[in-house]
Every structure is written in structure tokens, then in C-alpha cells.
Amino acid sequence: MIVRFLCWLTGLLLCTAAYALPQRVISLAPHATEMAYAAGMGEQLIAVSAWSDYPPEAKKLEQVASWQGINLERILALKPDLILAWREGNPQRPLEQLANFSIPIVYLDAKTLDDIPASLRQLATYSRHPEQAERAATDFQQEIGRLRHTGEGQNAASLRVFIQFGTQPLFTSSQATLQSQIVSLCGAENIFSDSPVPWPQVSREQVLRRQPQAIIIGGSPDKIASVQTFWQPQLAVPVITVNEDWFSRSGPRLLLAAQQICSQLTALSPGSSSAK
């Protein structure tokens, strides 16, 4: 009788735990959507933000947010039991209003590379497949560790890199950003790592004074020629391209950006047989 009771109680607890998981999740940022899928929450998502295009299944979901704002009325009509948000990218007032309706909000605001596996583990507590979240977090950590070890061994700190966003105006990133941290991970030096703001606007003259030895841009290789033309004749250095979505979104695919950048920087490092 006792054994039967314990079995019944165990089953009840398991059912209660499963029932407590959110069933109707809304993501308000592309990187949050990617994080949710990586954490095994894809089947729990009911709506996403604009530009949530990865994985491909995300494009089939209703969009309730964009750069223009959050569709508060539609979100409330969908009756979510969890919202994944982004402090820097989502307007705060509608988020406060959603919180007033007692809708739980999880903020995914990675500031460092280590924050990404931490966020995946946080999402594991809401996922029907927590083991998938843990596996994604572990894989990310291990590969970042490998790249860090390789970068330290390259002795490439003398390779000065300019991370370029746009041309007119011209923006870059400081060490406070994930993009700059990737450059450091690869053993190189971001020439504007010391900027007091994360995304400084810089002038052509400021870049030239700091004498970069390579430029990193987000986009496809067909952009290289226009970037080289922009800097000629004062600056003629290699231009490295990286998939823009990988590089700009603070999600699991940032690891792919790191692999791509580290590989290309290694080829340019002093002592490399590929260095020119």
C-alpha cells in the first residue's frame, strides 16, 4: 500500500511540474527567439518579433513586435504565460504594462559571452526539454573555452582590429560589447576597446590614427570591395566578413561568428603561414 501511494505521489508531482511549465510563450526579440528554440522551447512559442527568422520554423509564427513597438493589445489577446524580452531593444512602458497583468517576463540581456550559456540554463527551467538547454549551454561553453585557449596560443595581441558598422555615420564597439569580446577571445585587439560607451560613433580620422591592421564587418564577402574603396588610399588592410545575424544577435549562433572570426584572424596573425 505504501509503495503504491509513493508511486501515485511521484506521478502527481511529475504531472504538476509539467503543468507548471509555460504553455504560451512570446518572444519579443530575434535573439530571444533563437535562445528559446535552442533551449527546447520551440513548441511552446506562440508569437515572436519581426526578424525572428531562425530557425526557419520561427517564420511561421505570428509577429507581435517590431522596431516600431510592441502590439500590447494583441499580446494580451493571445494570453501568454511567459514573455521573453530584451531591455535594450524593447520599449519599457509596454513591458511594465504587461507585468501589471501579472505576466512573467524573462529578460535575455547577455553582456558577456558567459551570459549566453547562463541564459540557456535559465530557460531550461521553463522548457519541456531542459536537457536540450543544458546540452546547448555546455556545447557553447566548451567551444568558447577552446577558442580562448587557441587565441591565447596565437600570441596575436599585436593584431589591431577595427570593428566597423556602417560608413556614414561610422560606428564601432567597445569592450563592453559581445562583438569586441569575440575579438579579444581570438587573441586580437579592438582599437576602440577603451571607449567609455558601448557603441561609439567615430570619425575617419580617429580610425586612421589608431592604425588598424584589419577590419571586421558584418555581411557577405561581396561587401569587401566597397569597404576597401571607402578607406583608400589612406588605409589598405584586410577586410574580414562575418554573417551579420550571427554577429549581431546575442544568441547561440554568436558562437558561429566567433569561430568564423577567429579562423580569419588566425590566418592574419604574425607567424601564420597565411599572413600577408
UniProtKB/Swiss-Prot annotation:
GO MF annotation terms: cobalamin binding
Superkingdom of the organism of origin: Bacteria
Pfam families: Peripla_BP_2 (PF01497)
Gene Ontology BP, a term: cobalamin transport
Chain positions of site Important for BtuC binding: E73, E205
The keyword Magnesium is annotated on this UniProt entry: no
The protein's assembly and partners: The complex is composed of two ATP-binding proteins (BtuD), two transmembrane proteins (BtuC) and a solute-binding protein (BtuF).
Family: Belongs to the BtuF family.
Name of the protein described by the UniProt record: Vitamin B12-binding protein
Native source organism of the sequence: Pectobacterium carotovorum subsp. carotovorum (strain PC1)
